[in-house]
Amino acid sequence: MTDEGPGMCWCLRRCGRNTEDLLLPDGEEVTLGRGLGVTYQLKPTLCPLMISRTHCLFKQNTGGEWTVTDNKSLNGVWRNKERLEPHKAYTLSEGALIQLGVPPPNMESAEFEYMLVREHLEKLSGSLIRPLPDKTKATRTKRKFTSEDTDASGNEGPSNFSIPKFYRVSREDEDSAKSSHTTDLYKQPTVEPTASGTESRLNDSVEAEVVAPTQQQCRSTLQLSRVRQTMEEIRRLNVQMQEKQMEMQEKLNSPLENQVGANSVLAVQKELRALHNHLSNEQEQHMQSVKELKEIFEEEQQSMGSRKQVEEEHLKEQLAQALQEHTQLMQELNRSKNDFEQIIEAKNKELQETKEEKEKVFAQKEEVLNHMNDVLDNELQCIICSEHFIEAVTLNCAHSFCSYCIKSWKKRKEECPICRQEIVTETRSLVLDNCIDSMVDKLSPEMKNRRAALILERKEMVQAEESNPVLVVSDSSSFLSDTFYISSSSSDSDELGNDFWMRSEEEEYEETLFGCGTDELDSSDFESDDDEEEDSFLII
């Protein structure tokens, strides 16, 4: 980072409102702070204590690069937004951002921010800041006490105030004091108790009435710093007055007091009066500063109270508005609730009506089904098998029977079982079959299954009769008493002893074969037209 061209130099350029350049001479150590023993003195305006007395220092390393070191400052040093550790050197590159302290409240950037730049010295001539002179940077020497001062302080005993840093009268003035004016000196008012009492009262007033300000209250902070300065000045003047009195006491007690001239005594008295007047002025100024600080504090309290009152009013307005919105919302919810209750009530009423209608329809359906069952049982039932017509057949006399039942009946009689009219024609009644099927479809599943089983059983019986014919052997003279049925296969029709069964009662034969009682079929139906007693054989 050494200069490459003539006239080029390194400097710290301030960022923000004020454009200032701090020159960094090669090979020299540059210090920044608010104290007197620094290269460039920084005077903060927003917060006086933001910058330390010796805040940081800049110097070049062996490679010619500039480095920055935090001198254990209170508010720190930042390089490119990163805080540096105290007493540790950090190298800087061109364009590096150096921040001293932290940003004050309600501000985004710190008051002192610098950027390391490299420019021609001619361009920087108008914005360069002059460093402090060497005499201000020199350290102050400590005051040396003579043997007489040491003895005097030892004779007087311990004092509550420190004596260094204050002016003392010369030895010539001490020798010019005269004993003839001792009474005049004793008539002078004593300043020590007055000054110390005033100082104690001022300290009490400051501690009782002044509250330590925060960094947000910059005005009160500045005023408080002035108050502290005046208090220091009052202490210094008070110590000077005490020293003068101690010197006068020494002069009075010395053996050379008779040799003191009147002029020197008057000079000392004049100096004491001047110090007393100066102290009085400082006290008045201090009281005025305390009064101003109190007024500032009261103004801040009033402003805070007014802001608090405004905030409370604003919060009350927001609360009232929120309550109003809540009330409106509750009203809307109540209206919606009432509407929903009305809708639910209407739906319940509609549901009840629908339920009643369904019950009525179901009752009507039950009534229709019962009527259909009555019709099926009374009008569409075969008189032979007492079941609903299966393949209904209508005779010439208009009576209807099952096809299987009438065929079985015709094997014994060729006349209608109801009206005894001769059977001439048989007609299939598809209308009855379709009507019965439609009505059965609307009945219970048990009825449907029962009818399907009957139809299947009838088909099996027809197929069995077609495959195995039955031979009926009967005696015409004794048919009503004894009847024999012998069944055999078609291949061996002459043998009649394989499978047979016998029934003795005529009623049982009629119920088994035709499904009707003897009240409808009498014994005359089975009498033969032939009067001769002979055996007859019927093969089915």
Swiss-Prot record:
One of its GO terms (cellular component) is ubiquitin ligase complex. A zinc finger (RING-type) spans 382-420. GO terms for biological process: DNA damage response; DNA repair-dependent chromatin remodeling; double-strand break repair; double-strand break repair via nonhomologous end joining; epigenetic regulation of gene expression; isotype switching; negative regulation of transcription elongation by RNA polymerase II; positive regulation of DNA repair. Residues 519-540 have a biased composition (Acidic residues). It is an enzyme of class 2 (transferase). GO terms for molecular function: chromatin binding; histone binding; protein homodimerization activity; ubiquitin binding; ubiquitin protein ligase activity; zinc ion binding. Residues 128-205, 517-540 are annotated as: Disordered. Residues 30-84 form the FHA domain. It is found in: Nucleus. It catalyses: S-ubiquitinyl-[E2 ubiquitin-conjugating enzyme]-L-cysteine + [acceptor protein]-L-lysine = [E2 ubiquitin-conjugating enzyme]-L-cysteine + N(6)-ubiquitinyl-[acceptor protein]-L-lysine. Keywords: Chromatin regulator, DNA damage, DNA repair, Metal-binding, Nucleus, Transferase, Ubl conjugation pathway, Zinc, Zinc-finger. Gene3D superfamilies: 1.20.5.170, 2.60.200.20, Zinc/RING finger domain, C3HC4 (zinc finger). Pathway: Protein modification; protein ubiquitination. CDD domains: FHA_RNF8 (cd22663), RING-HC_RNF8 (cd16535). Its EC number is 2.3.2.27. Residues 152-162, 179-200 have a biased composition (Polar residues). Homodimer. Forms a E2-E3 ubiquitin ligase complex composed of the rnf8 homodimer and a E2 heterodimer of ube2n and ube2v2. The FHA domain specifically recognizes and binds ATM-phosphorylated MDC1. PANTHER family: E3 UBIQUITIN-PROTEIN LIGASE RNF8 (PTHR15067:SF4). E3 ubiquitin-protein ligase that plays a key role in DNA damage signaling via 2 distinct roles: by mediating the 'Lys-63'-linked ubiquitination of histones H2A and H2AX and promoting the recruitment of DNA repair proteins at double-strand breaks (DSBs) sites, and by catalyzing 'Lys-48'-linked ubiquitination to remove target proteins from DNA damage sites. Belongs to the RNF8 family. This is E3 ubiquitin-protein ligase rnf8-A.
